[in-house]
A protein has these predicted regions:
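Small-residue-centered hinge/linker elements
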Residues: 2-255, 286-338
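Short, hydrophobic alpha-helical packing/hinge segments within bilobed ligand-binding/sensory domains
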Residues: 147, 262-263
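Short acidic-hydrophobic, aromatic-tinged amphipathic segments that line or gate anion-handling sites
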Residues: 157-159, 272-278
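PDZ peptide-recognition modules
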Residues: 237-238, 256, 263, 275
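A non-catalytic alpha/beta surface segment that caps or lines the substrate-entry region
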Residues: 278-279, 285
Length: 338
């Protein structure tokens, strides 16, 4: 009888221990999947009810340039420049313009450099986003012609109140040194051999001023660009045709009417909509779009984060393009030919 009870207890203990082991393993497995799920979930970028903050810092390029210099990692002077691919930047703006999840787009292009053609494309994309009903708030501490071209497509432009710079979109300039007298004074005889017209490259060594052919070449190049800039800035701000040119030609008079204060002048003539300090801008953004207490400004995502949400869509579109005919292949080449 005792041996029978012992056998029952032994079997019961084994079953009980096995059940506990199974439950323990199940708990470990569920905990593992929960942790992994939390990690993946935290990597997911939420766009609903967010503000897209576009604050690019760098230079816009058609294709980022790679460098393979052996001592690049030991650079101590910080000469490397952040490169932003134009296609990616345009993709962010165009998709954001039709994304109903986003509350608005905040733009600051103070630290962005772009060539004329790239700036015109960015301006077109911002204008299209605004026409699609997306509110765009542009903030700046001061802009020149190309920067203002892009910012002028925003729904609202806010200039930093106490900024030492201002908004001065009044054309292009080209500066060059002419050193003929210098070389004569130091008794250096410069001999330049050139054939044909429009050979202005070496004029810095042979003249003290710009030649008529060099003036003509520069004006032929820059005038169409300036005309396009003016029309887009005027369309973006709702100005009548010719206002940007008038403001540029008469800015000294307009500034004098506002006590020589460039920021007040920009506000008075409509180049910007508001003057605010950064703290006032923060309060204004929170009032318009709301914010949780722990955030310094309305909840939002960066352009890089938003671009990551478009990658899957880009891959599927790329597969479709592979199947299409009559495609044009673009090959970017960099480096020296040896």
């Amino acid at each position: 009888m005792i041996s029978f009870v012992d056998n029952v207890l032994v079997k019961f203990r084994r079953v009980f221990i096995n059940i506990l082991t199974v439950l323990f393993l199940m708990l470990i497995t569920l905990s593992f999947f929960y942790v992994m799920g939390s990690l993946f979930e935290s990597d997911k970028v939420e766009t609903e009810d967010q503000v897209l903050y576009l604050e690019p810092n760098g230079v816009i390029l058609d294709k980022a340039i790679t460098r393979n210099e052996p001592f690049e990692e030991f650079e101590i002077f910080g000469n490397s420049t952040n490169q932003i691919e134009l296609e990616s930047f345009l993709k962010v703006i165009k998709n954001a313009g039709t994304d109903d999840d986003l509350k608005a787009i905040y733009v600051n292009v103070d630290d962005l450099s772009a060539y004329y053609t790239s700036a015109l494309k960015i301006a077109d994309a911002l204008y299209e986003a605004r026409e699609n009903g997306k509110e765009i708030i542009a903030f700046t501490s001061g802009l020149g012609t190309t920067g203002y071209l892009m910012a002028s497509q925003a729904t609202e432009i806010i200039l930093e109140k106490d900024s030492y710079e201002s908004v001065l979109p009044f054309g292009f300039s080209r500066v060059r040194q002419y050193q003929k007298d210098f070389f004569e004074n130091i008794k250096v005889d410069m001999n330049v051999y050139a054939a044909g017209d429009f050979k202005s490259g070496p004029e810095g060594y042979t003249r003290n001023d710009m030649s008529e052919t060099d003036k003509l070449a520069w004006l032929e190049f820059v005038t169409p660009v300036w005309e396009k800039y003016k029309s887009k800035m005027e369309a973006g701000r709702g100005f009548e045709s010719g206002k940007i040119q008038y403001v540029g030609d008469n800015y000294h008079l307009l500034s004098a009417e506002n006590g020589g204060n460039d920021n007040e002048t920009a506000l008075a003539i409509g180049l910007v909509d508001k003057l605010m300090s950064k703290q006032e801008l923060r309060n204004y953004m929170i009032e318009k779009y709301g914010s949780k207490e722990e955030y310094e400004r309305p909840e939002g995502i960066s352009g890089r984060e938003y671009l990551s949400t478009l990658k899957d869509r880009h891959v599927s579109n790329k597969k479709k393009r592979v199947q299409e005919k009559n495609k044009i292949a673009i090959i970017h080449v960099e480096g020296a030919i040896v």
